Amino acid sequence: MAELQIRKKEKKSGDGIGTMVDFLLANARLVLGVGGAAMLGIATLAVKRLIDRATSPPSDKEAEEKAEQKSIEESWKEAVLKKASPTLRRKEDLEHHCAPLSLPDPSQKMPEATGTSQVKASDEIKKIPICFTLQERLLNYHTHHASVPEVQMEEARQLVLDIKKELQEFLHAKHPEMPFLALHLGGSFGNRLPMSCLDHACLIMPLVLEPDLWCVIPGQKTILSDPNFCMVKRIDLEYTSRGSSPWDRFLVGAYLSSRTMVQSLHKTIVGSINWPAIGTVLDCTIKPDITSDELKLEVVHPNGHMIIRILPMAVIKDADLLAHCCATAPAENLWQRSFYKKEVSRLQELDSSDSGIRLKCLQILKGICRDCPSLCHLNSTHLRHILLHLSTESSDWTETALADRFLQVLEELIGYLDKGFLPSYFNDKLNLFSSLKAEDIEELGYGLYQVFSEPDDVLKRER
């Protein structure tokens, strides 16, 4: 009876403590929030269980310990879920997704991939960057960007030949007294070399000068003292009167004036030839350039646009002299020695002797100069002479050495620009950079350095 009364008092005392704890937790939720109240509830519940364990009989301790453990675990899980931050949850998710996967059992059949998963897999494969060597990029650039298909090249060549024929017939009819030789194709069209683009062509207009009436004065012996230019002098005027040569009409003083000749031809080509009618017959539009000091024809055909330059060339013995009549020329009777035939012939001989890639490298370089505005002052003559100079220094010009030779050409060009002097391969006194201004050289040097340091930026460009 006494024990029963003691238990009732202990139970009443325990109920009082529980009521007080519930009151504290209810108010703590208002002050601390749900998470804080949960943590406080765990601690308070632990204290309460300790008090109950101390006052309860030994037979009830095991059941109460199990209930206590379960209550604490549930309260802890609830508190963690309520208290956990989004950052921690993301971290747990990441760890879950990044967990190592076990290898599938070979005996089990793999599930068949759906159409969507196959598309996603192919898209992911396409996104994987493919790394190419410089050698591979150069060959790809040569094939897809620096080479014109043979069919297109032949069509453009035939169009230029048709225009040449019309011009030739008109000049013979207009000036029968002038001993013009037959016009012929110049440049890559004339040599049937591979081309990087079809936006330009040239027609050579040979002027046959009598060797006993004309002589070439080297540039060093003229008042300009410039080896890049020469003059054509009329000789034996004491014994052969003026007018003995059909070219005497273009004399200024005792010298054959390139400017007077070009201006006379310009008037004929611009004002006397019915280019609209010729263009209609050839299915194109032909317009002579009336603003330029040079002889140019602008041709628009179904496949694109083309500029045809007409170059008067005096032929004296073994010298080919191009008329130099630009507005900035220091005199009106200047002629410039052309080594084009020798340049191309020498490159072809070298490539044939060692199965080289000099002409292929030339195509790539011409394409890069076309794609980079900063390299517009670098012309084909510069590139041909650089390749000829390097051919005397480097012996390996096989296709496997294309990348090395390409970088070497750029490096040599930068070196020559730094000196401001690129000697001609056939006459080391001639400076092929003499026509460039200081700002042109600076721009070229910067552009070449960019190509040399980051060639992929140029080679990956689309046409």
From Swiss-Prot:
Keywords: Membrane, Mitochondrion, Mitochondrion outer membrane, Transmembrane, Transmembrane helix. Residues 48-463 are cytoplasmic. It is a single-pass membrane protein. Residues 1-24 are mitochondrial intermembrane. Residues 89-98 have a biased composition (Basic and acidic residues). The chain crosses the membrane at residues 25-47. It is found in: Mitochondrion outer membrane. It comes from the Eukaryota. The keyword Repressor does not apply. Residues 87-119 are annotated as: Disordered. GO terms for cellular component: mitochondrial outer membrane; mitochondrion. Pfam families: Mab-21_C, MID51-like_C. Mitochondrial outer membrane protein which regulates mitochondrial organization. It is required for mitochondrial fission and promotes the recruitment and association of the fission mediator dynamin-related protein 1 (DNM1L) to the mitochondrial surface independently of the mitochondrial fission FIS1 and MFF proteins. Regulates DNM1L GTPase activity. Does not bind ADP or other nucleotides, in contrast to MIEF1. Belongs to the MID49/MID51 family. This is Mitochondrial dynamics protein MID49. The gene is mief2.
